[in-house]
Structure formats: C-alpha cells, structure tokens
C-alpha cells in the first residue's frame, strides 16, 4: 500500500508520526512532549483527536484515532488542588457565551461544536475554579435562536450540570 511505504518516496514524510504536546503560555507555546510519558516516545498513524472527560472527574482526557489501528486513550490522572464545574448545554447551544466569576475575577468561553478530523469532542464545557470550591455566578448568553441569558448565583463545583434555555441547573 502506498501510505505504508511513504518513507521510500519522501525523506521527510512519515506514515507513523510522533505525538506532540505543547504548553500554552498565553502568547507562545512550549514543546513539553518529553514530559508526556511513554505514549509520546512512539510513532502513530494518528489522524483524528477527540477531547472529553471520559470518567467525569473534571479532567479532560484525549482519544486519538489511529488509521487502521486501535485508538489510543490518554487518561488524565493529574491530581491538583484546583476545582471545576462542568456544563452540558442542551439544545442548539453552539456559539453560547459562558461567563463566570470566581473570587471576583471574571472568566469566559464560547461553547463550540465539532472537533478534529473524523472526530467529535465532548460537548460539555469545563469551567476552571482554581482553589475555590464554587463559582460566584455563572451566566449563559444563548445564541440568537434562544435569544436569552440565564444567570445562576453561588454554584457548587466538582460536578456536571445540564442546562436548557430558560431552565434551572440540573
């Protein structure tokens, strides 16, 4: 097969490529692949990636689709003192603006859909709380179709909530 012999055609193309891991510093990225563990020392025919909290612990895990092979699951086992809140927005929520406050500091993100090539990531959003066990408030500004904003005060962390436009956190 051509794709398995690509190395004989090109000196720089590879069928199996190494996984890469970067740390976001806000404005630049540092290559931290060497800190990623044994999975990052091998080559894979990786062609898709999905991110999701597979065990509902608030830490995102990664599933990598390998062309013609078994998927690779990178289970996030990092333990730290930080807290989180998970939101499962129901209905047509792509584009919703989620804002929250922790200790008087405002944070925000846009709810996205989709994922990577032939992959779809977990639709739930994880809101970071740092050392605080709860959010001062959470606000969801729904996309134009719903045309509303929902706000919730003093939301406890460490769990997932479901929310539809105009409803209570469940």
Spell out what each predicted region is:
Residues 7-8:
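Acidic, low-complexity, intrinsically disordered peripheral segments
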Residues 11-170:
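Gly/Ser/Thr/Pro-enriched helix-cap/hinge segments flanking short amphipathic alpha-helices
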Residues 1-2:
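Short, small-residue-biased leader/transition segments that mark boundaries at the very start
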